[in-house]
A protein has these predicted regions:
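A broad, structural micro-motif
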Residues: 8, 23-24
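Structured surface patches comprising rigid loops and adjacent beta-strands/short helices at the edges
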Residues: 26-30
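Cys-dependent protein tyrosine phosphatase-like superfamily
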Residues: 3-4, 10-11, 19, 31, ...
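Ser/Thr-glycine-rich phosphate-binding loops at phosphate-binding pockets of nucleotides
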Residues: 242, 246-247
Length: 350
């Protein structure tokens, strides 16, 4: 099929550059989207142009000016030839999986300098304890998962160990010790109900504050970023128990290091409420069978399964109070000096 100055034949995306024909296998394209430039309308007549943007596994970027219809048809054909190719801007959306409700690909999130996180490289999640075989296959073959970072404590790992996926490297980096684990631990419904009466809402704010104030936790987040620095191929997935507190803060710190604006960081953080909604409904139904659901218990359930902007507020406030700025926190606490920051961005941005 021919689209403007390019064509697709025998599974290859073919185009001319510098008077030479180039053959790009469609299976090597990981991301493609439509880019609009210029402005339409307004007081003076202006124009916009549409381009097809293609990103390859080697992070090479190509842009071809085409009509909207040509772009649409071209993407459809390439997607048929390469079903694993990402199209459009998922922007940190949930990965549709059977057994993992809060697993997300940070791909396509935009940085302040206009770059984007590469899709299928950075994945945040909850526990992999009950991951289905279908979901394992998806992570292995579609996302090329190569590394898992477990933020849980040793006791949590023993109680609900990760399902080991062949060919994947595992790192245990407990963000908190057993004594300060608190509500971030996802226990059984009975355990949670017993703790609900003991844990005030203020505890959550203190918990988030400690994640960037406690020396142990800070060093563990530094280890997490170091794993990402030394990752060469495939996707990295990091998780805790529910994928909201320890993972939420770790993801926020990573996005800061990559130069993602705060507004986007907050949006990603708050998506947990949407993705854990069904888990919360299940818990409520379970407790209703025990005839022990009142308004106070309901409030505690929501406290556990939801996040608030205030939680991330206190993270940034604590960092500013202790280190003066996020830049100093990155440099002094997480060892993300300008050189390491640039290495990280070269690995995961395009």
């Amino acid at each position: 099929m021919k689209y403007g100055k390019i064509r697709i034949e025998d599974g290859n995306f073919i185009f001319s550059k510098h008077m030479m024909m180039n053959y790009l296998p469609c299976k090597d394209i990981i991301w493609t989207y439509k880019r609009k430039e210029g402005v339409e309308g307004g007081a003076q007549k202006q124009y916009s142009t549409s381009s097809l943007v293609i990103i390859t596994r080697r992070k090479k970027r190509y842009q071809f000016e085409m009509t909207d219809r040509e772009i649409q048809n071209c993407i459809q054909l390439m997607r048929a030839l390469n079903p694993q190719m990402v199209t459009g801007f998922p922007q940190g959306s949930r990965i549709s999986m059977q057994s993992l409700p809060n697993t997300r690909d940070l791909g396509a999130l935009e940085t302040e300098d206009g770059r984007h996180i590469l899709p299928k490289r950075l994945l945040r999640s909850g526990s992999l304890y009950h991951i289905s075989i279908t979901d394992q296959d998806m992570l292995t073959h579609e996302y090329h998962l190569s590394t898992v970072v477990d933020f849980r404590t040793r006791m949590e790992c023993l109680e609900k160990p990760d399902t080991i996926i062949e060919g994947v490297q595992y790192h245990e980096i407990p963000i908190v010790d057993e004594e300060t684990l608190g509500i971030t631990r996802l226990g059984s419904p009975t355990e949670l109900l017993r703790n609900f009466k003991e844990i005030p809402e203020e505890f959550m704010l203190k918990q988030y504050e400690s994640l960037v104030h406690d020396e142990y936790s800070i060093k563990q987040y530094a280890r997490f970023l170091d794993v990402l620095l030394h990752q060469n191929e495939g996707a990295v997935l990091w998780h805790c128990s529910a994928g909201k507190d320890r993972v939420g803060v770790g993801t926020a710190l990573l996005l800061c290091a990559l130069g993602v604006p705060k507004k986007t960081i907050y949006e990603d953080f708050m998506k947990t409420n949407m993705y854990l909604d069904k888990e919360m409904e299940y818990m409520i139904r379970f407790l209703e069978t025990k005839m022990i659901v009142d308004n106070q218990v309901m409030d505690k359930i929501r406290l556990f399964y939801r996040v608030k902007e205030e939680y991330l507020d206190i993270v940034f406030e604590t960092i500013k109070k202790d280190f003066g700025s996020m830049d100093m926190f990155m440099k002094k606490a997480l060892y993300m000096n300008p050189k390491n920051m640039e290495v990280l961005r070269k690995k995961y941005l395009v």
